[in-house]
C-alpha cells in the first residue's frame, strides 16, 4: 500500500506536524513505526490552501492520502481532530458542490485512538463531521488536524502528538465501519463510539443537514466511506421528523441502523455474528433485546428456551444471581422483553446449545432447592410455599384491613374479642409441580 502524507507550506500546523514526523523518523522505535509496516510512505508539500488542492498535488500511485493541517474554529478550543472531506451543500471552502471525498473509516479510527493516547494536557480529541474540500482526490483521504489558533498550531507538544498519531497508525480489521447522522461539528457521540467501541466512522453529517438530505447524498456517503456496514443516528440530536426522514432513506437504500448501545454490547464478536443473533432474537418475539455474556464465538446461533414456570420459580427476585451465572458460562445472550423484563429465552451457538440447555436446567433446579422448600422426584420438581390464606382469616373472624397486613407480615394480632391469631393459624401450604422432561438425566 502506498500512503502519501500531504501538507501545505502556507499552513503552520501542517508544516509543524510534517517537521515533527521528519524528526521522529530519525529515531524510530524498535521494529519501526506501524505506518511503515508493509506500506510505502511518500511525502508531498503544496503551495496555498489544501482545501483547494488539485488531484495533481498528490502521488498518482497513492492508495491513501493523509493530510496534516491546521484546524480553525469560531469557538476555538485546543484540539486534535481527524475528519473526512466533503460538501453536503454549496462548496464554500473548496471542493465541488454536493460532493464528498473518498475516505477510510479504519484509518481515521486508528488516528483518533492514537490522538487519545498521545494528546497533550489541556487538549481534547475529536472526530469532526464531514466538511470542506477537496472532494475529488481519486483515493481515500482524510485530514489530521491541530487546532484551533496560532498558539496551538505552533505548539510543539500538539504537533508532535499529531505526528505520532500518524506514524503509529495501524488499522484494526475488527471494526464496524459506519456513517453517522446528527450531532455538532465536533461529533461528540461519534467520537465516544470511535474511542470506546468497534465503531469506525466514515462520513458524518451535522444535525442541520439531516432534515433535507436526499437519498442520493446518503448513497454517496455510503459509497465514499468505502464499505460501511451500518448507519448510526444520534437520536438525541435530532427531531422526530428528522429521524423519520433519515430512517426512510436508510430503508430505501438498504442500510441498517445500529445503536450506540448495540455497538457497546458487541465486544469482541464480529458484526455478522451480532446481526445473526439479533435477527434470531427478533424471530422469537417483537422487541426482544439481546445482551451478551463473555466472549461470543462465531458460528450459527441457536435458541435455548427455558420452561417459563421453571425460570420464574427459580429466578423471580433473583435476577442478579442468574445474570452472574451467565457471566461465568460465557458465549451466551440473555434477553429482555417489554419494560426490560428478563425473559426465559436465551441464545448461544448451535454447537453449544445442548450443553447450555442442560446447564441452565441444572442451575434453575439448584437455585430452587437452595432457596425454597422443594422436592425433586424423577422428571418433576415440587415446590411448597407457605402463604397467607384470607379464607382462613375470615373463618377465624379476622376483619379485613390493617390486621390482615400484620398477619401477612408474620406478626400475631389480637382480635376485639381478645383472641390472639398467629400467622401459622392463617397460613396454607401451596404445592406447585413443574415437569421437566429428562430431569433425571441431569446431574
Swiss-Prot record:
SUPFAM superfamilies: AF0625-like, Metallo-hydrolase/oxidoreductase. InterPro entries: Deacylase_DtdA_archaea (IPR018033), DtdA (IPR007508), RibonucZ/Hydroxyglut_hydro (IPR036866). It comes from the Archaea. Keywords: Hydrolase, Metal-binding, Zinc. GO terms for molecular function: D-aminoacyl-tRNA deacylase activity; zinc ion binding. Pfam families: tRNA_deacylase (PF04414). Its EC number is 3.1.1.96. Binds 2 Zn(2+) ions per subunit. One of its GO terms (biological process) is D-amino acid catabolic process. It catalyses: a D-aminoacyl-tRNA + H2O = a tRNA + a D-alpha-amino acid + H(+); glycyl-tRNA(Ala) + H2O = tRNA(Ala) + glycine + H(+). PANTHER family: D-AMINOACYL-TRNA DEACYLASE. D-aminoacyl-tRNA deacylase with broad substrate specificity. By recycling D-aminoacyl-tRNA to D-amino acids and free tRNA molecules, this enzyme counteracts the toxicity associated with the formation of D-aminoacyl-tRNA entities in vivo. This is D-aminoacyl-tRNA deacylase. It comes from Methanocorpusculum labreanum (strain ATCC 43576 / DSM 4855 / Z).
Amino acid at each position: 500500500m502506498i500512503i502519501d502524507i500531504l501538507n501545505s507550506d502556507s499552513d503552520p500546523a501542517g508544516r509543524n506536524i510534517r517537521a515533527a514526523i521528519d524528526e521522529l523518523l530519525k529515531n524510530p522505535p524498535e521494529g519501526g513505526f506501524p505506518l511503515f509496516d508493509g506500506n510505502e510512505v511518500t511525502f508531498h508539500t503544496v503551495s496555498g490552501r489544501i482545501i483547494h488542492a488539485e488531484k495533481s498535488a498528490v502521488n498518482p500511485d497513492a492508495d491513501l492520502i493523509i493530510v496534516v493541517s491546521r484546524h480553525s474554529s469560531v469557538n476555538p478550543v485546543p484540539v486534535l481532530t481527524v475528519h473526512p472531506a466533503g460538501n453536503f451543500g454549496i462548496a464554500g471552502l473548496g471542493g465541488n458542490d454536493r460532493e464528498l471525498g473518498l475516505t477510510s473509516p479504519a484509518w481515521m479510527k486508528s488516528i483518533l485512538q492514537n490522538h487519545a493516547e498521545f494528546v497533550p494536557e489541556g487538549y481534547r480529541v475529536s472526530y469532526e463531521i464531514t466538511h470542506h474540500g477537496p472532494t475529488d482526490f481519486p483515493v481515500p483521504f482524510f485530514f489530521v488536524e491541530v487546532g484551533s489558533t496560532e498558539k496551538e498550531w505552533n505548539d510543539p507538544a500538539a504537533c508532535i502528538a499529531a505526528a505520532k498519531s500518524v506514524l503509529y497508525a495501524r488499522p484494526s480489521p475488527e471494526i464496524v465501519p459506519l456513517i453517522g447522522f446528527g450531532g455538532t461539528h465536533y461529533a461528540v457521540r461519534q467520537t465516544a463510539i470511535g474511542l470506546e467501541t468497534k465503531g469506525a466512522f466514515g462520513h458524518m453529517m451535522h444535525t442541520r443537514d439531516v432534515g433535507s438530505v436526499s437519498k442520493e447524498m446518503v448513497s454517496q456517503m455510503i459509497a465514499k466511506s468505502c464499505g460501511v456496514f451500518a448507519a448510526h443516528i444520534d437520536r438525541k440530536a435530532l427531531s422526530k421528523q428528522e429521524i423519520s426522514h433519515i430512517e426512510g432513506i436508510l430503508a430505501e437504500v438498504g442500510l441498517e441502523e445500529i445503536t450506540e448501545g448495540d455497538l457497546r454490547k458487541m465486544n469482541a464478536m464480529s458484526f455478522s455474528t451480532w446481526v445473526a443473533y439479533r435477527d434470531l432474537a427478533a424471530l422469537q418475539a417483537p422487541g426482544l433485546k439481546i445482551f451478551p455474556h463473555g466472549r461470543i464465538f462465531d458460528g450459527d446461533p441457536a435458541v435455548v428456551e427455558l420452561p417459563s414456570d421453571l425460570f420464574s420459580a427459580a429466578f423471580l427476585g433473583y435476577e442478579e444471581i442468574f445474570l452472574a451465572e451467565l457471566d461465568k458460562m460465557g458465549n451466551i445472550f440473555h434477553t429482555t422483553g417489554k419494560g426490560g423484563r428478563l425473559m426465559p429465552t436465551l441464545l448461544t451457538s448451535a454447537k453449544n446449545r445442548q450443553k447450555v440447555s442442560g446447564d441452565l436446567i441444572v442451575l434453575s433446579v439448584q437455585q430452587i432447592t437452595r432457596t425454597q422448600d422443594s422436592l425433586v422426584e424423577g422428571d418433576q420438581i415440587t415446590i411448597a410455599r407457605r402463604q397467607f390464606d384470607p379464607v382462613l382469616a375470615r373463618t377465624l373472624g379476622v376483619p379485613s384491613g390493617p390486621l390482615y397486613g400484620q398477619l401477612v407480615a408474620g406478626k400475631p394480632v389480637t382480635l376485639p374479642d381478645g383472641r390472639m391469631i398467629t400467622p401459622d393459624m392463617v397460613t396454607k401450604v401451596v404445592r406447585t409441580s413443574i415437569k421437566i422432561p429428562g430431569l433425571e438425566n441431569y446431574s
